[in-house]
């Protein structure tokens, strides 16, 4: 079984809302047009933080953010591969970005996150936010 290691940015703006991005059409129906936190694969010889900066620059043209802390690592078994995802809480006061790889986005409060149709691997991150970050 193929194993993939990725990073995800749980990006919070100055209003305390989180950036949720929607994947485009995909041949893998279980991630087709699902919502996720932006991020992507860690390249060889790249740290998790370096991967996060590179991926947000590639996917969103976003460079103005700070990595605050690591939130959670999720291991999820999809039908075709095993995904290990390292999620980091990131902040940006005035995040300006462009959707280069996604088809839609929302800024949502923690309690609104469950309204979206999330990729299965992102659900534990959403639950973690609801259980921990909403108290801060």
Segments and roles (model prediction):
Residues 1, 10, 26-28, 75, ...:
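Short secondary-structure boundary/capping segments
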Residues 4, 13, 63-66, 72-96, ...:
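Active-site-adjacent beta-strand/loop module that shapes the phosphate/pyrophosphate-binding cleft
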Residues 17-58:
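Conserved Nudix-box catalytic region and its N-terminal flanking loop in Nudix hydrolases
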Residues 42-43, 76, 112-114:
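Short histidine/acidic/glycine/proline-rich micro-motifs that form metal-
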Residues 130-136:
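Generic C-terminal helix-cap and adjacent flexible tail
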């Amino acid at each position: 079984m193929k194993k993939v290691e990725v990073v995800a940015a749980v990006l919070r703006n100055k209003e305390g809302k989180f950036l949720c991005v929607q994947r485009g059409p995909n041949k893998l129906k279980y991630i087709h047009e699902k919502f996720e936190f932006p991020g992507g694969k860690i390249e060889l010889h790249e740290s998790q933080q370096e991967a996060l900066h590179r991926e947000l620059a590639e996917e969103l043209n976003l460079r103005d953010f700070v990595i605050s802390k690591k939130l959670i690592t999720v291991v999820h078994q999809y039908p075709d591969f095993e995904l290990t995802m390292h999620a980091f809480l990131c902040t940006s006061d005035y995040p300006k970005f462009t959707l280069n790889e996604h088809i839609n986005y929302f800024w949502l409060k923690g309690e609104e996150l469950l309204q979206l149709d999330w990729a299965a691997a992102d659900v534990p991150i959403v639950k973690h936010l609801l259980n921990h970050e909403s108290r801060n």
